[in-house]
Curated annotation (Swiss-Prot):
It catalyses: tRNA(His) + L-histidine + ATP = L-histidyl-tRNA(His) + AMP + diphosphate + H(+). SUPFAM superfamilies: Class II aaRS ABD-related, Class II aaRS and biotin synthetases. The keyword Oxidoreductase does not apply. The lineage of its organism: Bacteria, Pseudomonadati, Pseudomonadota, Gammaproteobacteria, Pseudomonadales. One of its GO terms (biological process) is histidyl-tRNA aminoacylation. This is Histidine--tRNA ligase. The gene is hisS.
Length: 428
């Protein structure tokens, strides 16, 4: 017997009992973004590898270790997208939709791919909802993105579980001055750095600030501080952001070691973190990337955005038991029919109900079965009500209306009154 083929490690099936929560989360985010005037964009999941090398940075863990890269039949190097920002910028440039200073407020949702060690809430195929804004340079739009996420946490009941961390990376010139000071400080202590940090010292020294190695973190306590090297424009931008968050009543923590894992960030960077999921605590992160559009061949264009991890936020909702009870219900109403004539009538009645009550979740029993077995299936579906149609009901042009979640006698309802009566029951 041949061995069953299984899913690739770190790439998981999302089963029917899980998808209602995913849909609830995605619908909550989409509705909120629509309300703020953001428009959806959809990009391909495969891009030329060069896009990510130029945007993310060649000397990053993502490009060096984690990308799924392959050569196609034409000899082109292609990569499954590891994140969405670079693809979105490529699309905006390719189609010219940010030219002439046009403001674009965009969002997307879909799978991303990174070959890293699978762990709780972290997978090799994972899903993100991303938001990107082009041609707005001020701290007001940075604040809007954070206010928007704060509102989302409120809608989902997660505000008490997340903390906002902020930092400013300053201008590229300010970072260059700081980089020199940091390299000088760490070079004198090179032997005490962990292996990854030693490698990064010559290629991407700011990423050392993000090291998880305890000895390296101890060395950084007395290292030069990025805040001391900020240019005046970045300083004012950061103060403007903090002032707006204060007015909005959003608490935050300044984290001077927050640098983000991608090379294109500058000025504002932020993360929403939680301590409810163990070590992998970031659920949403972003910042400003004013130089990326030009870096990818466009004109200088201010830009800012964020991405949130769907798996981690779904896991957080489950961990904190913030899952709405109705999500366990497959349908609102289950139609039981006994006998061929009743089955035919039930089909017609069900379609009339769907016409009369848009949005009604109604399942008609398939596969026949006894009264007891059909009611058992109705109960298992989570339906609030069962409709019962047998020979007697058919003869009298009535339907039995039975509550599955409350005590009470089955009611007989005429076919013409069924839609109105059912609507009243579901509103109650």
């Amino acid at each position: 017997m041949s061995k069953n083929i299984q899913a690739i490690r770190g790439m998981n099936d999302i089963l029917p009992e899980q998808t209602p929560l995913w849909r609830y989360f995605e619908k909550s985010v989409a509705g909120l973004l629509d309300g703020y005037g953001y428009r959806q964009i959809r990009m391909p999941i495969v891009e030329f590898t060069e896009l990510f090398k130029r945007s993310i940075g060649e000397v990053t863990d993502i490009v060096e270790k984690e990308m799924y890269t392959f050569e196609d039949r034409n000899g082109d190097s292609l990569t499954l997208r590891p994140e969405g920002t670079a693809s979105c910028v490529r699309a905006v440039l390719e189609h010219g939709i940010s030219g002439g200073g046009q403001v674009q407020k965009l969002w997307y949702v879909g799978p991303m791919f990174r070959h890293e060690r699978p762990q709780k809430g972290r997978y090799r195929q994972f899903h993100q909802i991303g938001v990107e804004v082009f041609n707005l340079p001020g701290p007001d739009i940075d604040a809007e993105l954070i206010v928007l996420t704060w509102r989302l946490w409120g809608l989902l009941g997660l505000r008490e579980a997340v903390t906002l961390e902020l930092n400013s990376l300053g201008s590229s010139e300010a970072r260059a001055r700081y980089r020199e000071a940091l390299v000088e400080y760490l070079s004198a202590r090179f032997e005490r750095l962990d292996e990854d940090s030693q490698r990064r010292l010559s290629s991407n020294p700011l990423r050392i600030l993000d090291s998880k190695n305890p000895e390296t973190q101890a060395l950084l306590v007395d290292a030069p501080k990025l805040a001391d090297y900020l240019d005046e424009d970045s300083r004012q931008h950061f103060e403007g952001l903090k002032a707006r968050l204060d007015v909005a009543g959003i608490p935050y923590v300044i984290n001077p070691k927050l640098v983000r894992g991608l090379d294109y960030y500058g000025k504002t960077v932020f993360e929403w973190v939680t301590d409810k999921l163990g070590a992998q605590g970031t659920v949403c992160a972003g910042g400003r990337y004013d130089g990326l559009v030009e870096q990818l061949g466009g004109k200088p264009t201010p830009a800012v955005g964020f991405a949130m991890g769907v798996e981690r936020l779904v896991l957080l909702l489950e961990t904190l038991e913030r899952v709405p009870a109705e999500l366990s219900r497959q349908v609102d109403v289950y139609f039981c029919a006994f006998g061929e004539a009743a089955e035919l009538a039930a089909l017609g009645l069900a379609e009339r109900l769907r016409d009369a009550l848009p949005g009604l979740r109604l399942a008609v029993n398939a596969g026949a079965g006894s009264f007891k077995s059909q009611l058992k299936k109705a109960d298992k579906s989570g339906a609030l009500y069962a409709l019962v149609l047998g020979e007697d009901e058919l003869a009298g042009r009535i339907v039995g209306l039975k509550s599955l979640r409350a005590e009470g006698e089955q009611q007989s309802v005429g076919w013409d009154e069924l839609g109105e009566r059912l609507a009243a029951c579901l509103r109650a």
